[in-house]
Design a protein with these regions (language model features):
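Helix-to-loop junction immediately C-terminal to a conserved catalytic motif
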Residues: 1
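Conserved ABC transporter NBD signature motif
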Residues: 9-17, 25-26
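ABC-family P-loop ATPase nucleotide-binding domains
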Residues: 28, 32-90
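Catalytic Walker B motif of ABC-type/P-loop ATPase nucleotide-binding domains
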Residues: 103-107, 112
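Helix N-cap at the start of a conserved alpha-helix in ABC-type nucleotide-binding domains
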Residues: 114-116
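ABC ATPase "signature
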Residues: 163-164
């Protein structure tokens, strides 16, 4: 969000060039969940909500409280004593409680147990049911991508190798698991 400058190329987010000064005003419209949740360890969930209420103009304390209840998060337990799953749920509650239009998820479900991951994926699906809501997700968990995404892009060493509709990829391509010799013996176009 302005901390890094691209070496080349451009990035447009919600219609604004990421290098343009007006891009900073979009921070209210973007919710971010990283692979690790970063909140002051001494704060509890209620205190985190208080800080966020001063950070975001559109902070919805009632919505935040609803997520805390839905996730079964303790309101007065210090963040440092949260499990990984609890930390991720708190980060998701924060990201969703200021009415973002775009969620940016960086390995947000990695390391979560399957039950928690399914619960989180359902919340992300609920989010995208709103027409003006989108998710940009970075994940190594292919089943998460299959459940959430309409389009799949593959980046390698900072380059976009392909971007296509998920359904087209599922229809036209498959996954082959084999030894190096088996892969080398495949015919071209197989």
């Amino acid at each position: 969000m302005g901390a890094l400058r691209p070496d080349s190329g451009t990035c447009t987010v919600l219609g604004a060039d990421s290098a343009a000064p007006e891009f900073l005003s979009l921070k209210e419209d973007i919710g971010v969940v990283l692979d690790e949740a970063y909140f002051p360890e001494s704060l509890n969930a209620l205190q985190v909500g208080g800080v966020m209420a001063k950070t975001y103009r559109r902070w919805d304390g009632k919505q935040y409280q609803n997520y805390l209840t839905r996730f079964g998060l303790p309101e007065k337990k210090p963040f440092k004593d949260f499990s990984r799953g609890m930390k991720m749920k708190l980060a998701i509650a924060v990201a969703l409680s200021h009415s973002p239009r775009l969620l940016v998820l960086d390995e947000a479900t990695a390391g979560l147990d399957p039950i928690v991951r399914d619960e989180v994926l359902e919340i992300f699906n609920e989010f995208t049911r709103e027409e003006d809501h989108s998710i940009l997700i970075s994940s190594h968990i292919l089943s998460d991508l299959e459940k959430l995404c309409d389009y799949i892009a593959f980046l390698h060493q900072g380059r976009l190798l392909f971007c296509d509709e998920k359904d087209r990829l599922l229809e036209e391509y498959g996954i082959f698991v084999g030894t190096a010799d088996q892969v080398n013996s495949l015919q071209d176009g197989a």
